[in-house]
Amino acid sequence: MVAVAILAAGRGTRMKSNLPKVLHPLGGRSLVERVLESCQLINPEKRLIIIGYQAEAVKQTLEPYEGIEFVEQKEQLGTGHAIIQLIPYLQNFQGDLLVLNGDVPLLRSESLHHLIEIHKTNQNSATILTAHLPHPKGYGRVFCDGNNLVTQIVEERDCTDAQRQNKRVNGGIYCFNWPQLAEVLPKLKPDNDQQEYYLTDVVKYLNSVMAVDVEDYLEISGINDRKQLATAYDILQNRIKDYWMRAGVTLIDPDSITIDDTVELQPDVIIEPQTHLRGQTVIGSGCRIGPGSLIENSKIGENVTVLYAVITDSEVESGCRIGPYAHLRGEAKIKASCRIGNFVEIKKSTVGEKSNVAHLSYLGDATLGDKVNVGAGTITANYDGVKKHPTVIGNNTKTGANSVLVAPVTIGNDVTIAAGSVINKDVPDDSLAIARERQKNISGWRMKTDD
């Protein structure tokens, strides 16, 4: 049995933020969410989140995750003090405790699984995840004997000059035999410059503590300030983009592209420069996305082209062409083989198959049938200042340039709306609707001048 404890009580003053450090976002999810999800494959018996600074905000963020227990650390007196708070929650627990830091978001599940396996196989009192860093500044140093058993862990601020030459560092990830750890926790003393209870001090009280090196030292990267947050984002992006390129996705100028790890891409997708894919986005095979596009929480069908467009919370079916400079939002649904063109905004509307909205239009709260042609400058006037109203347009209908459809209004099938019309009444099938003043020409007229 394994229980997981995540240390998430600190403020993180170097972030210079009112937001708790563990709630800062990294690629669409908070740091602590990423840590929590890294241990999902372990299937722990218990998941304990140690909270302190802005505890309610942390609770609210993690509310969607089931089976979590929150442990409050009212005073932040070090990592050892944090683990002492677990004693009432694990009184009858006889398994192992995996301790994770809420600000170390790049850990892979495989690394944690390997750590636990080594711990169990060797029947260690504790097993520590370590790494050899080229530049170990800021990390505690781990000292081992010839059998990889830990003899000492020294925080950097307490290291001598000679000890600082050791490049094997403590990753802050531990697997403990809980009954043995619980027995020695009361022995911890705050006898250091920080007057804190260091969890690493338990090493001298436990029988066998082994160090295990992580395969990629970047996994243990901690986040203490905005620069480190940006560095972690780069590492995460490189992982994601490497995965998708190996899976058959073409990234043109990968450095200018960002992809959340919640995004799903099919083979033969081409992502052009300056494109950003976020949230629960799914993109079908054969699509060409970008350049200069943002797609968030949206589903894109096969063989869709998106050029300089913003698409959020929407769905685009196969064979569509979107952009340039189109904006789809608020549950817009574009059915197959449509063209949504220059400077078009579509919000909370459905556009039927093989329809065109090519230029300078706004469609809000509208339902369009199949093979509708929306002329340049057509607007649905859906808001009366109090509430929004629907517009319905039937199959094979055409709206002329600069038309205004004042909702609520229903336009039938096979209707033509004359250019420049303001339509505020329903139009039956097979009709021509004209709603504008008749043109009047005044012969011999001249504009007055000063001459």
UniProtKB/Swiss-Prot annotation:
Residues 248-451 are annotated as: N-acetyltransferase. The lineage of its organism: Bacteria, Bacillati, Cyanobacteriota, Cyanophyceae, Oscillatoriophycideae. GO terms for cellular component: carboxysome; cytoplasm; membrane. It is an enzyme of class 2 (transferase). Binds 1 Mg(2+) ion per subunit. Pfam families: Hexapep, NTP_transf_3. This is Bifunctional protein GlmU. InterPro entries: Bifunctional_GlmU, GlmU-like, GlmU_C_LbH, Hexapep, MobA-like_NTP_Trfase, Nucleotide-diphossugar_trans, Trimer_LpxA-like_sf. Pathway: Nucleotide-sugar biosynthesis; UDP-N-acetyl-alpha-D-glucosamine biosynthesis; N-acetyl-alpha-D-glucosamine 1-phosphate from alpha-D-glucosamine 6-phosphate (route II): step 2/2; Nucleotide-sugar biosynthesis; UDP-N-acetyl-alpha-D-glucosamine biosynthesis; UDP-N-acetyl-alpha-D-glucosamine from N-acetyl-alpha-D-glucosamine 1-phosphate: step 1/1; Bacterial outer membrane biogenesis; LPS lipid A biosynthesis. GO terms for molecular function: glucosamine-1-phosphate N-acetyltransferase activity; magnesium ion binding; structural constituent of carboxysome shell; UDP-N-acetylglucosamine diphosphorylase activity. The gene is glmU. Catalyzes the last two sequential reactions in the de novo biosynthetic pathway for UDP-N-acetylglucosamine (UDP-GlcNAc). The C-terminal domain catalyzes the transfer of acetyl group from acetyl coenzyme A to glucosamine-1-phosphate (GlcN-1-P) to produce N-acetylglucosamine-1-phosphate (GlcNAc-1-P), which is converted into UDP-GlcNAc by the transfer of uridine 5-monophosphate (from uridine 5-triphosphate), a reaction catalyzed by the N-terminal domain. GO terms for biological process: cell morphogenesis; cell wall organization; lipid A biosynthetic process; peptidoglycan biosynthetic process; regulation of cell shape; UDP-N-acetylglucosamine biosynthetic process. It catalyses: alpha-D-glucosamine 1-phosphate + acetyl-CoA = N-acetyl-alpha-D-glucosamine 1-phosphate + CoA + H(+); N-acetyl-alpha-D-glucosamine 1-phosphate + UTP + H(+) = UDP-N-acetyl-alpha-D-glucosamine + diphosphate.
